[in-house]
UniProtKB/Swiss-Prot annotation:
Signal peptide: none annotated. It comes from Synechococcus sp. (strain RCC307). The gene is coaD. Pathway: Cofactor biosynthesis; coenzyme A biosynthesis; CoA from (R)-pantothenate: step 4/5. This is Phosphopantetheine adenylyltransferase. It comes from the Bacteria. Substrate binds at residues 8, 40, 72, 86.
């Protein structure tokens, strides 16, 4: 069975990566799809986010990274994905995600939503939090893969040393 994990991934975090790795053990294929949202100004370009995701998932043969625009449920149907994966960090995530799941079900009864609880070490983690920490010079190496930490330091014009040391 094929699953779709959509998101902005701006940037990809260890929370995202944990969910991708666990999903890859449950499904034959996991499509990690970066949403091209014309109404948002991401910190990283679509190409940068695709490269970040491809790099950190290259060791997972059943993971495919791509992008899409439009309704997630329509893209899931185009990709023959029967499941949309969503990570839940807290109860507050559940209410919003449940509304989306019900909306998707009303648009297509052929695609289910599967909620996966975020692993405890990543339960506080969001891309917004990571960018805020990085913006003010905080260490994000425990929050994102090393290549993404380097990208964040470059984004915020901070010194980048070889080997990830600051």
């Amino acid at each position: 069975m094929r699953a779709l994990y959509p998101g902005s991934f701006d940037p990809v975090t260890f929370g995202h990566l944990d969910l991708i790795q666990r999903a890859s053990q449950l499904f034959d294929e996991v499509i990690v799809a970066v949403l091209r949202n014309p109404n948002k100004q991401p910190s990283f370009s679509l190409e940068e986010r695709l490269e970040q995701l491809s790099s950190v998932t290259s060791h997972l043969p059943q993971v495919r990274v791509t992008s899409f625009e439009g309704l997630t449920v329509h893209f899931a149907l185009e990709q023959d994905a029967r499941v949309i994966l969503r990570g839940l960090r807290a109860l507050s995530d559940f209410e919003f995600e449940l509304q989306l799941a019900h909306t998707n079900a009303s648009l297509s009864g052929q695609v289910d939503t599967l909620f996966m609880a975020t692993a405890v070490p990543h339960s506080f983690l969001s891309s917004s939090v990571v960018k805020e920490v990085a913006r003010f010079g905080g260490d994000v190496q425990h929050l994102v893969p090393e290549t993404v930490a380097i990208d964040l330091r470059r984004l915020f014009n901070q010194r980048v040393d070889v080997g990830g040391d600051r």
